[in-house]
Every structure is written in structure tokens, then in C-alpha cells.
């Protein structure tokens, strides 16, 4: 079968097609069609010839098969050190083989490659940190995902996710009207406790333009309110854009590079329109990577810089605490043992470990590091889209064991997880293994312990 009704090589560009795909519960028909989806070998090889640059070719050639990447991979470790889980083997037996065969691979090969690309690697790039040749396995697996996506071999949930970005400009069906109404609603809800609090929309020349994850207005609107409360306490001159507010990119997980470009260009257009002094992104790892690290290159910015200076939320919080914009009541600091999850995308891959430790020094009396930690920490177990793929849930749950054991070794009762994927993985970890922990973003914790300036307190009756 050349292409199916649901599983095909075409991106999802219309609301009608998106709703039809969503109606295929669990991707039942989608995956059935995938088993018969023919590989367009000529198009695959033409794609490789056009996009596979010297760096990727060199990495594939210089791998010495030394095995240094093996123990660095948490999936290798939790799968009984199966040699087929060694990162070098995983990439050589998939991407390397596609290139060696000049694209002449069949459906069964692509089905296998899809499973490896999305259930045996989260693109955390911990292995790349230990490679003596500096091979960036995360980049190579991302490239493999792009090739698979172009041929229609992509998990159902991620085909939907990239379609959401194409159709709605967000990873979920949140329209501009929905978003602006959520901002108004959340501001109104806070008036009694936080008089004067606003969520300003489309204010030009603000000091901060805040962007976030579509899950927040869709499922966790209180997160939008919490961000507003902390900006309010800090006295920030800030705004959100009515368009270009969504900074995440499920398209990046899917390997839909055209949708990645579309998504980040919406955010950058908002920056150009509103001209803020800087941008602050929410507590999300992959969103930061998509908008602040990879984004400039997708959007054609050759210098690799965003249109305005960009801060991850942990950078802004650390600055606000350091400068006294937000002050912590010592009596309200976290007293119980607490540990911290390091998001791969902004700790290992963007060097922000000092910011998160600085924050913990202000808010925790008994902070306990995981072992290993900082840039050496392990992936939460659900990154790179792994959390959301039902087909690979069994493998994902097994992958959570490494993080489970790290947390247990600290004796912590609370895990601070300033990243949506990490937050989800640790929530699921507790549901699966029942180890008796709680987990939290930074925002609600800091609000509970912040000293509220007198002029921001509600008048006593």
C-alpha cells in the first residue's frame, strides 16, 4: 500500500485532517496502515543527499565502537545492559544502515528504526558528553527522526502533535481567543488575594515578554496565574503576546522540521512586533531548546541568536531572588528533604545548573543532590516525546527506574522539577512505583514562601 488514509507521508495541515486522525483512537488504523506503508526509496535517498552534511557523515565514520557511550545511557542500564541498547549500535544499525544502503530499505526496517528512534533514545545526549570523539548522538537521532517522519513512520501522537502546531500554532487546540480569555479569567480570579494584578497582553516595549507551554492555558491555567503573581511580586514590567505565546514544539520530537520553523517564527514575530527588552520562557526544557537554542537556526538566523535576549524561567527566578525582587521568608523555606531534577535540555545542553542550585539555596533547608547530578544527571525517563507515546508506554515505564533509584537514594520526599516533561515523568514514576514522593514546579513553591510587599497585600476589612 503506497499510503494510507491516516498513515502517509503528508503532514497534517487542516483542522479536518487533524480531527479525523484524533478520531482514530489510539492510532489503531494508523498503525495498521503503517505496517503496509511503502518506503519511497528514491525520495528518501534524495532527502539524505540534500540534508546529510559532512558532520553527520564524519560522526558515523569515526565512531570507534569503544563502548564509552554504553553505561552513560540509562536505557542501556535498565535493559540489562543489552548490547543492542548501546547508543553507538542503535544509531549505526538505523541511520548508519539507511545511509550505507543509499535509502534502499523496506517497511520492516523503517518500523524497526521508528521503534529505536522513539523508544530507545530520548535525545538527552548524555552519551555524547562521554564520547571521546564528541559525537552528538542526540543530533543524529533527531536527524533519523526527521527521515522517518518524511516517510510517514512516526508515532501517532507525534503526528497529531506536529499537526496541532501547523493548524493551531500550538501543541494543543488553544486558539488566540481561548488564550486571551484565559489571561483575563486568571487575572480576575486573583483580584481578591492580589489586588491590582494584571496579565498584560500585547504591551509594546515591556521589560519582559513571557511565553509558555500550551498545556498551561489548556489544562493548568493556575500556572499562568502563578507566573503573573511572581511577576507582580517582583514588580516587573511584563506582557504576553496574543499571538506567538506558545514556545513548545512537539514538531521537534516528531522530526517535522518545517513545522518547527513555522512554530518558532510565530514567537519571533511576536518579539519583533512587541519589542520587549528580553523574553522569559516557562518551566520547560524542550520548549527552551526549541525556541532559544535550535530556534534561531530553524528561523534562518545565522548568528544563532534570538531576536531579543532570552532567559529560561530558572534564570529569571535566580535573578529575582539574587537582586531581592523576590524575598523569601526564612520560616517558610522547605524543611523536608528535597531534591532537584536536572532537565537535559537546559542543564546538560545549555549549562544552567548554577541557576537551579542558586534557587535551591534560597528555598530549601535540606537540599539533597541526586547522584550523578547537574550536566551528568540522567534523563527523567520520558524526554524526547517518550512520555506521550502510548505504543511505547511499557518501555517508558521501565525507563523510569533509573530516576526512581536516584530519588530513593537521596531520601527526599519532594522533587523539584522545573520542566513539563520531567514533571510528567516523575508524576508517572510515583503512580507506577509508589515510592512516596511529591513533585512540584518552582512557581507554587516560591509563592508560598515569598514575602509579600505591604503595598501588594489586600486591604483588611
UniProtKB/Swiss-Prot annotation:
[4Fe-4S] cluster 1 binds at residues 63, 66, 69, 127. The keyword RNA-binding does not apply. One of its GO terms (cellular component) is cytoplasm. Pfam families: CCG, Fer4_8. Its main location: cytoplasm. It comes from the Bacteria. One of its GO terms (molecular function) is 4 iron, 4 sulfur cluster binding. Residues 54-84, 112-140 form the 4Fe-4S ferredoxin-type domain. Keywords: 4Fe-4S, Cytoplasm, Electron transport, Iron, Iron-sulfur, Metal-binding, Repeat, Transport. It is found in: Cytoplasm. PROSITE patterns: 4FE4S_FER_1 (PS00198). [4Fe-4S] cluster 2 binds at residues 73, 121, 123-124. HMWC (high-molecular-weight cytochrome c precursor), ORF2, ORF3, ORF4, ORF5, ORF6 in the HMC operon form a transmembrane protein complex that allows electron flow from the periplasmic hydrogenase to the cytoplasmic enzymes that catalyze reduction of sulfates. ORF6 is a redox protein. PANTHER family: FUMARATE REDUCTASE IRON-SULFUR SUBUNIT, HETERODISULFIDE REDUCTASE. This is Protein DVU_0531.
